Amino acid sequence: MISVGIDVSKGKSTVCILKPYGEIVSKPFNITHTQKDLSELSSMLFRLNDEVKIVMEATGIYHLPVLTYLQEKGFFVSVVNPYLMKSYRNESLRKAKTDKIDSRIIANYGIDHWFKMKEFQTSGEIYEELKLLGQQYRHYMKLHLLSLAELTHLLDLTMPGIKNLLASWNETNRKDKRSDFVERFWHYDVITSMSEQEFTEEYILWAKEKKYVPSQEKAKVIYALAQESIPTLPSETSSIKMLVTEAVRVLKEVDATLGLILSRMQEIAKTLPEYSVVREMGGVGNTLAPKLIAEIGDVRRFRNGKALVAFAGIDPPPYESGQFVGCNRKISKRGSASLRKVGYETMRSLKMRSRPEDPVYRYVVKKESEGKSKKSAKIAGLNKFLRIYYARVTELYKNI
């Protein structure tokens, strides 16, 4: 019975090996994440000729090389949630923290939780690829929001009010009418330099070219706004056209990347057996289906629906003391924030498209009728949605 505690950091780790009752097999020592050092570590563990369990704390991506190598060598490896390890570490009165101390604490955790520890299970290449794509999608969405904010700021100076007339990027059809329009008509002075009839004709030609609705009424509204508005920066300012067109170009490049990633996610997700089941659930469309699967991963790794709900961090923790029993508890938020976000988008989509036959929709409506806020009702609906998701997908895999 030997516990190997590994405190992982970027590019290197500190290893401590213990037996029960604090018997030290090997004092803490450092290794780098290279084939040579990891090979020497695995050879050392094989020579111990005893049952070995390796424990490490989840550290984003830094622990993955060590985890992958040791699992390929056949070792039992448990990856512990950082919050659990923090709680265990806080049991000590002394608050000293070094890599050597941390590795010893992790090794002690392995001894104390020897029979409760679970071996880390990989989710499969498809789920891992979807997860990576989902992470990159969120990254580029942040860039999209930043780029959109910069363009909006410039438009407030050159074309105030235009953002209320033209829609921005649509995640479903991946078209951005506002950016397309500003790329062609980058300042109100460009519009007012023409007569209303000339601008209307130009707008109709532009709309047909970009495959938008060629509405004369819309053109007249835009022209009237251009005449009435007061741009802060005149078009004669030498840098204005360059700044506006560059802001549009950057935004479009980010949006194109988002479109490529989402297309790849849809392509991969459609190869999974559960895709059709997830796609048929209320509120889930072609965009949200791959996102949900990417965030949840292989649902078979959860022991029941409650575990999936806890993974999302929307489980209200019980609280009671003496005669008091807490009823109106808030969600824990100790889980995947990205899954909560995608799940909330799903509930919004479900509520917008009334589906009285859907059990989750009826549940959300019921909670709202009981006096719950719309947000609380949607979170309650998400709780029910994830339980149904778990039941349907696991049932599917049982029958395969």
Regions found by a protein language model. Give the residues of each.
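A detector of single, family-specific signature residues
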Residues: 1-400
